[in-house]
Amino acid sequence: MAEAQIDSQLLDGARRALVRHGWEGATLQRLADEAGVSRMTLHRRGVSREALLAALGEQLEHEYREAFWPALTAPGTALERLELALDSLCDVADRNLELMEALGHAERDLVFHERKRPALTKQVFTEPVQRLLADGVADGSLAVEDPEETATVLFNLVGHTYRHLRAGHGWSPKRTRKAVIDLALRGLVAR
């Protein structure tokens, strides 16, 4: 079968359908309705729910890469740049809060986790954090034994906790960022 033809109109519609109906309720008909196309158009373009999920995952990968870039290229210690990266992670989480809440665990796993078990978070999401952790070990600002594993822990610690406190507890972005990032960084600072 040919690769699905998914444009920004379909992705935006998929986001709306997922937010409104959740993954289980986001039928192809609802996805088509939210995108302003017919279900037959989705069929002709080779679009399935799974293809839309994969495309949304690619969109998230791009958003995280773009968000982390300034922290990778900024001046300062690795600790300062890591704080900037974690703040950027919170920015992406805020922009995608409703989408992430609408996806089930299995769908989030497909987007973020490696397939093997035990799994790390996909490198496309954690590689920038891993780089900053390794830089911190090199410049003495961070105490980290395994940057690769710590990057997965940190990405998930900040991402999940931030999302939960924002969506589940109704905390403001400012309050949540300070609480989560300060706590996460305290465990990494070289003493």
Kindly label every feature range from the protein language model.
Residues H62-R65, F112-D139, E148-T152, R163:
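Amphipathic alpha-helical packing segments from all-alpha helical-bundle domains
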Residues G13-A17, S88, V92, L157:
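Short amphipathic alpha-helical elements of helix-turn-helix/winged-helix folds
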Residues E3-I6, L10, P147-L154, P173-R177, ...:
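Short amphipathic alpha-helix in the helical subdomain of ABC transporter nucleotide-binding domains
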Residues A93-H113, A167:
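Amphipathic alpha-helical segments used for helix-helix packing
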Residues D91, Q123-A138, N156-L157, R163-R191:
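C-terminal peripheral helix-coil segments that are non-catalytic and often amphipathic
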Residues A55, W69-R95, T150-L154, K174-R177:
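Hydrophobic alpha-helical connector segments
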Residues Q5-Q9, G13, A17-A51, A55:
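Helix-turn-helix
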